[in-house]
Amino acid sequence: MLPSTIQTLTLFLTSGGVLLSLYVSASLSYLLYSDILLKFSSKITAPTMTLDCANASNVQAVNRSATKEMTFLLPEPEWTYPRLSCQGSTFQKALLISPHRFGEARGNSAPLIIREPFIACGPKECKHFALTHYAAQPGGYYNGTREDRNKLRHLISVKLGKIPTVENSIFHMAAWSGSACHDGREWTYIGVDGPDSNALIKIKYGEAYTDTYHSYANNILRTQESACNCIGGDCYLMITDGSASGISKCRFLKIREGRIIKEIFPTGRVEHTEECTCGFASNKTIECACRDNSYTAKRPFVKLNVETDTAEIRLMCTETYLDTPRPDDGSITGPCESNGDKGRGGIKGGFVHQRMASKIGRWYSRTMSKTERMGMELYVRYDGDPWTDSDALAHSGVMVSMKEPGWYSFGFEIKDKKCDVPCIGIEMVHDGGKKTWHSAATAIYCLMGSGQLLWDTVTGVDMAL
C-alpha cells in the first residue's frame, strides 16, 4: 500500500542528538538535548544564527549546528474486513442508554427527542446514531415529535456510552431516514430527506458532503435505519422506494470514499423489502434480515455477493415468524415462499452474525407480543440456510419484558483487537401520543461468556413526571 499522508518535520541536529531551540526572550535561548537515533534520508541546509549580546567584542561565536529536514511517511489506516467473532455462547445485557431519566435537565444538558437509534463501529470507536426532531425534553417543541418525516429531523450521533443531549450530540445532516458505517479510514454518513414524492439520499464522507441519489419510485425513498457494511473500502447500503402497503423494491448502493460507484438490483422475491439489518456472513457474503410491511410476517432475507455484486432475496422459511404483527408460529402452510396472513404492518428486526472457524450463528430478535410493540426476545440458529430451514429457531432469552416497549431492533459489531463482538440493540420508545413528547431509549446486548441470558432491561422513565 502506498501511503498518501506525508508529514514533514524539521529538526535541528547537533552532534549529541536533537536540538530544540526554545526562545524565551529576544536575546536568550535554551538548548534541550535528547538521544534519538533517526534513520531517514535528509538534506542539509545552511543555518541562520542571530546573536544579541551587550559586549559583542568579547564573544566568539562558533556555529556547529545545521538544519536537517526529514520526511516521515505515515501510512493510511487499513481498510476493514470482517473477522471471526470473539468467543462466547450467549448474549448478556451490556448497556442502557436512557436519556430521559435525565429529563429534568435544561439547556445544553437536556436530552434530545429521538427515534430510530442505531449503532455503528469503526476500528477505534462506536457511535450511537439517531434521528432527532431538533427538540429536547423538557422544552416547548413537542408537537410533531411523533411524525416520521418533517423538515426538522436530523441525523445525530454521540460516542457510544454518552447520553444524546444537546451538548453532546453532533448533527451530521438533515434527515428523516439514516445510516452510517466506517470503512477503516473514515466515516460514511447517509441521510434521506425531502418531500415524499421526491426524496433525496445524501452522502457525507468525513466532513465533506460527497454524493446524492434521487428517488426512483417517487414514494418515500428511504434507507436501513441501521449500519451499512464495509469491506476493503467498499460500503454497501440498502435503500427502498415504494408504497408502505404495496410494492417497494429495494436496491443496494456500493459506495467508496463517499461516492456511489455501483447500483445493485436484487432478484428473487422482490415485492416488498425495507429496513434491512445487514452484516457479514463471510468475506464474500452480506446477509440481511428485512421487513415486509405489505404481504407477510416472514422476513425477506437477502444474500449479497460482494465479489460479483449480485443480490437475491427470498423469504425466511423458519416457522418462527419474526415480524410484528404476526400469526401463530408454524401456522403458515405451503412452501417457504408462502406469505400467510397478518402480513400488513411490520417492524425493523435485529440480526447479527457470530462467525466461528467451523460454523456460523445467526442471532435474531423479535417482540414478545404478536400484535404490539412490546417486549423483545432473542433467538439463534447455527449453520443451515435461512431460505430453506423450516424448523423453529432456538429461544435464547428475554431482553425486554412484555411490560416494556420493544420497537425497532438492529445489529452491530464492536471491534476488539483480534476479533469482532456481535451485539443487538433495541429501541425502547416512550410513546406519548400526539399530545406530548415521543422519544426512545436504547438497550444493548452483546455476546459474552457462557450460560443463559440473565436479565431484561427497563427504561426507568415515567412520562407523567
Swiss-Prot record:
Bound cofactor: record note: Binds 1 Ca(2+) ion per subunit.
Designated name of the protein: Neuraminidase
Pfam families: Neur
Miscellaneous remark of the record: The influenza B genome consist of 8 RNA segments. Genetic variation of hemagglutinin and/or neuraminidase genes results in the emergence of new influenza strains. The mechanism of variation can be the result of point mutations or the result of genetic reassortment between segments of two different strains.
Residue spans, topological domain Virion surface: 35-465
Region (Involved in apical transport and lipid raft association): 13-35
Organism: Influenza B virus (strain B/Beijing/1/1987)
Name of the top EC class for this enzyme: hydrolase
Annotated keywords: Calcium, Disulfide bond, Glycoprotein, Glycosidase, Host cell membrane, Host membrane, Hydrolase, Membrane, Metal-binding, Signal-anchor, Transmembrane, Transmembrane helix, Virion
One term of GO molecular function: metal ion binding
InterPro entries cross-referenced by the UniProt entry: Glyco_hydro_34, Sialidase_Influenza_A/B, Sialidase_sf
